[in-house]
């Protein structure tokens, strides 16, 4: 019984099952049925989860369809009736998935009973779900002749069907009060088993009604199925258990798909804090029924009730993120842009290339993020909603390091924010203001105050250049403890500075007693502004001067004790800069007893006001050796009313000039004439690099002096469609300007003696210089021995290399033409142009390093196809020679050049003879032919 999954106990006997098993219902429907249903499911999945990949949606849809298709095939009677009833256009289906999740209306217990009575078991629910998914596709009517043998009479079957349809059509369509019951119950008239009597249906209706009362609002469909299995364990046969396994498998796949889709649903953090809500997991059955009901709709359109006003929510999230991060992001973008501009103004350095690329990439990323934050309300799209979490992550990652607020260390008496700029002097706590310089160490600044107790302590982020020498040796927290915390007062050492003759870098200036006037106070605040760049440049000088100052102090000042009240603390006009890196480890050499490292010592504040012995100023310094440094006071003041610190002005430091500054100065100092000449020379060099020259300046000098049009000078031995660029000819070009020729001549005279000395010591180099000349002589000898009408000779002209001429001397001319040709008296007047018939020799220049470099033609050769050139034998020969040399892949040897010149000259002579009625033997009588005879 367990082996046959298609078998089901029937109250009326097994004959009906045996008759129905003979016909497989899957063979009754259309072949394209499953494909159409699958396409519908995929379409609805894409509408629900448009942000996911298509292959994932297809995979889930195929598994979904396959499971429910296999479940529907297990029922014989239901399957055949499903084929018949699917031909109807309108099916009686009740679907609660169409109602919104928050539109919950009441429906009576009677309605619940009518709905639950339609679903006889969990297996029938699965069949109903699958059959409803197919209900949008029209199926052709199939023959039901085999059912006549199963049922007793057709009339009885029709009556039972009508009763069942009437029972289903009378179900109410009101919306349920339970959100998770949406789509949980769907009943089709074609899915009811005809062998179930109305009495059994009413009995099961009462049972399911009692079960529904015990369910809580918000339970999911799997929980309802679990309760159903617990209350009715005897009604679940093996077949129902198998169907339940399939249902659990489909639900697991749906849960995985919805878990992936939940990535794009980002909730606002502030809304979660103000309105804490528990996120309810979506019921898989709701998703399934939404897809199934949408497939029944003829228009194929559904309304996404869960969407809501997502556009407004997304805009509010972006707006909140913009208010929080856009100022910091804009400041970072401005700093990066300034840094890039500074870097571009400097000469490029190889080590900074990668760093600059990272800066540019970061700048582009910040611009993209700022563009996302500045989106308009009407421009918010689904892309902004889906990508909000990713943008939020990157924005917070960019601004994390910049949004960290520097909080001061909490003291025993109280705590103040760093942004506070004024506080009352009666407070038993002195703050240390933290100022972060540009990529510099953190510094702590002592606040300054006026003489009166009612004045405010102004916290300044910068130092005055006049007060930069005052360095306080303390990096800990400054506070005013009570007498119980520090019962004893420790004497301090006052050191003085030696004379200006030893240092020669600073001078003394006694400060005037400060007046509690508002005008002086404003002037003081204006003069306290300092440039960060000057501070970084002078910090090293101050460290050296401080070390020399303390080490050179030998005489002692009588120890004195000074106690001040917490409400009458007076500081000087300049704050005390704390820098742990520039102070020496141990500086005290006077022998005055001091406290150990890390202990509290007393630093007296110079004030004419009588002090209070119960409230000394204690400075806790955790740094070893730094607590031995005390404030430097002026010992030259003998009045005793006001002791002011010493000031120094460091000597002016040399300013390093940038290359661009030096260029500007040189440009301003030059005369207009020299600038014009420089521009001309630069243009000449650039044009020579960009263009290919074909002529060689035998007289020396620069190209600008020759006045040649280099664009018309083409290289003689250019390759024709060459693939190897390394085969191009190489030659040296003299680019020395004319006005520098005198300097070069003097330099050559000075270097001539040196060259003679070098030549005597390196005689082996002469062999290398002679070797190319010997190779050229050998080639000329071989060429003259092979050619008949062309003679190759070496000229005695002075040049940078060897000049060779190729002369054509025809030997097969008629007597009349030969005499005229040799005499050179054949003159033609064509178009009023005088042209000579004799072919002029070809002049070549072989460099000194030949054969390692190619020879150069010393005259202009161009290809001209005009008519009158046929009468000018020399021009015609050179035109042929120019065209022939372009066909060579590797020109540059004397053998090939001489052979080419010989062939071109002979072809020109033959062409000229044929045009005037002459020619060769072959041209008049025909070429020789090879005749083979059979022996």
Curated annotation (Swiss-Prot):
Region (Disordered): 1-28, 170-190, 495-526, 548-611, 635-654
InterPro entries: MED15_KIX, MED15a/b/c-like
Example GO molecular function: chromatin DNA binding
Intracellular or extracellular location(s): Nucleus
GO cellular component, one term: nucleus
Main location per the UniProt record: nucleus
Record bears the keyword Nucleus: yes
The organism's place on the tree of life at top rank: Eukaryota
Lipoprotein listed as a keyword: no
UniProt feature, compositional bias: Polar residues: 1-13, 548-577, 635-644
Ranges of compositional bias, category Low complexity: 511-526
Annotated keywords: Nucleus, Transcription, Transcription regulation
Any Pfam family the entry gives: KIX_2
Role of this protein: Component of the Mediator complex, a coactivator involved in the regulated transcription of nearly all RNA polymerase II-dependent genes. Mediator functions as a bridge to convey information from gene-specific regulatory proteins to the basal RNA polymerase II transcription machinery. The Mediator complex, having a compact conformation in its free form, is recruited to promoters by direct interactions with regulatory proteins and serves for the assembly of a functional preinitiation complex with RNA polymerase II and the general transcription factors.
Subunit structure: Component of the Mediator complex.
Family membership: Belongs to the plant Mediator complex subunit 15 family.
Protein name as annotated: Probable mediator of RNA polymerase II transcription subunit 15c
High-level lineage: Eukaryota, Viridiplantae, Streptophyta, Embryophyta, Tracheophyta
């Amino acid at each position: 019984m367990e082996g046959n999954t298609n078998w089901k106990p029937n109250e009326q006997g097994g004959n009906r099952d045996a008759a129905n098993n003979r016909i497989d219902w899957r063979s009754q429907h259309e072949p394209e049925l499953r494909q159409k249903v699958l396409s519908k499911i995929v379409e609805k999945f894409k509408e629900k989860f448009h942000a996911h990949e298509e292959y994932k949606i297809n995979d889930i849809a195929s598994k979904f369809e396959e499971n429910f298709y296999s479940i529907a095939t297990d029922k014989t009677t239901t399957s055949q009736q499903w084929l018949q009833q699917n031909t109807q256009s309108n099916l009686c289906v009740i679907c609660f998935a169409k109602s919104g999740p928050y539109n919950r209306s009441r429906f009576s217990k009677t309605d619940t009973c009518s709905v639950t009575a339609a679903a006889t078991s969990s297996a029938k629910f699965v069949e109903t779900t699958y059959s409803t998914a197919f209900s949008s596709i029209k199926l052709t009517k199939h023959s039901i002749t085999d059912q006549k043998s199963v049922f007793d009479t057709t009339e009885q079957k029709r009556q039972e069907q009508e009763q069942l349809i009437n029972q289903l059509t009378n179900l109410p369509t009101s919306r349920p009060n339970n959100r998770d019951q949406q789509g949980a119950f769907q009943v089709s008239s074609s899915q009811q088993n005809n062998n179930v009597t109305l009495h059994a249906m009413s009995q099961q209706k009462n049972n399911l009604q009692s079960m529904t009362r015990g369910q809580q609002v918000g339970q999911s469909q799997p929980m309802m199925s679990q309760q159903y299995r617990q209350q009715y364990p005897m009604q679940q046969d093996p077949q129902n258990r198998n169907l339940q396994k399939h249902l659990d498998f489909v639900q697991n796949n749906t849960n995985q798909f919805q878990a992936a889709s939940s990535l794009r649903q980002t909730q606002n953090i502030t809304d979660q804090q103000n309105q804490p809500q528990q996120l309810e997991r979506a019921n898989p059955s709701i998703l399934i029924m939404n897809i199934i009901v949408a497939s029944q709709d003829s228009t194929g359109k559904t309304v996404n009730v869960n969407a809501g006003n997502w556009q407004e929510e997304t805009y509010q999230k972006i707006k909140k993120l913009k208010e929080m991060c856009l100022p910091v992001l804009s400041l970072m973008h401005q700093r990066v842009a300034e840094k890039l501009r500074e870097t571009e103004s400097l000469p490029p350095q190889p080590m900074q290339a990668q760093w600059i690329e990272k800066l540019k990439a970061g700048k582009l990323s910040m611009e993209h993020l700022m563009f996302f934050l500045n989106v308009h309300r009407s421009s918010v799209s689904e892309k902004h909603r889906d990508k909000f979490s990713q943008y939020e992550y990157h924005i917070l990652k960019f601004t994390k390091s910049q949004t960290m607020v520097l909080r001061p260390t909490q003291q025993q008496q109280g705590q103040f924010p760093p942004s506070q700029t004024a506080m009352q002097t009666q407070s038993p706590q002195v703050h240390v203001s933290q100022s972060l310089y540009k990529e510099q160490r953190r510094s702590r600044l002592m606040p300054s105050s006026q003489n009166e107790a009612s004045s405010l302590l102004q916290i300044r982020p910068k130092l005055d250049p006049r007060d930069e020498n005052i360095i306080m040796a303390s990096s800990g927290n400054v506070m005013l403890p009570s007498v119980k915390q520090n019962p004893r007062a420790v004497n301090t050492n006052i050191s003085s500075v030696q004379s200006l003759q030893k240092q020669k870098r600073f001078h003394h200036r006694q400060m005037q007693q400060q007046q509690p006037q508002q005008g002086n106070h404003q002037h003081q605040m204006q003069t306290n502004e300092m440039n960060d760049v000057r501070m970084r440049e002078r910090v090293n000088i101050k460290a050296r001067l401080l070390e020399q100052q303390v080490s050179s102090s030998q005489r002692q000042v009588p120890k004195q004790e000074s106690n001040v009240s917490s409400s009458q603390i007076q500081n000087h006009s300049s704050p005390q800069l704390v820098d742990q890196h520039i102070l020496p480890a141990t500086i005290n050499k006077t022998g005055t007893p001091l406290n150990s490292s890390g202990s509290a010592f007393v630093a007296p504040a110079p004030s004419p006001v009588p002090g209070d012995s119960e409230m000394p100023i204690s400075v806790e310094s955790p740094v070893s050796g730094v607590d031995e440094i005390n404030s430097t006071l002026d010992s030259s003041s003998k009045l005793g009313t006001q002791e002011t610190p010493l000031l120094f002005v460091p000597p002016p430091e040399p300013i390093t000039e940038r290359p661009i500054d030096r260029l500007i100065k040189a440009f301003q100092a030059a005369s207009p004439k020299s600038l014009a000449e420089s521009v001309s020379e630069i243009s000449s060099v650039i044009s020579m690099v960009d263009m290919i020259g074909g002529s060689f300046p035998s007289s020396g000098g620069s190209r600008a002096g020759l006045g040649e049009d280099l664009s018309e000078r083409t290289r003689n031995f250019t390759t024709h469609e060459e693939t190897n660029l390394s085969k191009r000819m190489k030659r040296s070009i003299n680019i020395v300007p004319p006005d520098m020729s005198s300097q070069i001549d003097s330099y050559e005279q000075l270097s001539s003696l040196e060259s003679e000395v070098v030549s005597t010591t390196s005689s082996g180099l002469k062999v290398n210089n002679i070797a190319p000349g010997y190779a050229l002589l050998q080639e000329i000898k071989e060429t003259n021995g092979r050619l008949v009408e062309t003679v190759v000779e070496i000229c005695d002209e002075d040049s940078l290399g060897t000049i060779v001429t190729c002369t054509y001397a025809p030997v097969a001319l008629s007597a009349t033409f030969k005499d005229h040709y040799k005499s050179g008296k054949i003159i033609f007047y064509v178009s009023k142009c005088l042209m000579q018939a004799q072919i002029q020799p070809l002049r070549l220049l072989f460099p000194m390093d030949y054969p390692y470099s190619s020879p150069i033609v010393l005259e202009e050769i161009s290809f001209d196809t005009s008519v009158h050139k046929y009468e000018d034998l020399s021009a015609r020969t050179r035109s042929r020679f120019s065209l022939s040399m372009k066909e060579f892949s590797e020109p540059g040897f004397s053998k090939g050049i001489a052979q080419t010149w010989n062939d071109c000259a002979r072809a020109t002579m033959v062409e000229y003879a044929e045009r005037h009625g002459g020619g060769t033997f072959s041209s008049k009588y025909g070429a020789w032919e090879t005749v083979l005879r059979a022996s």
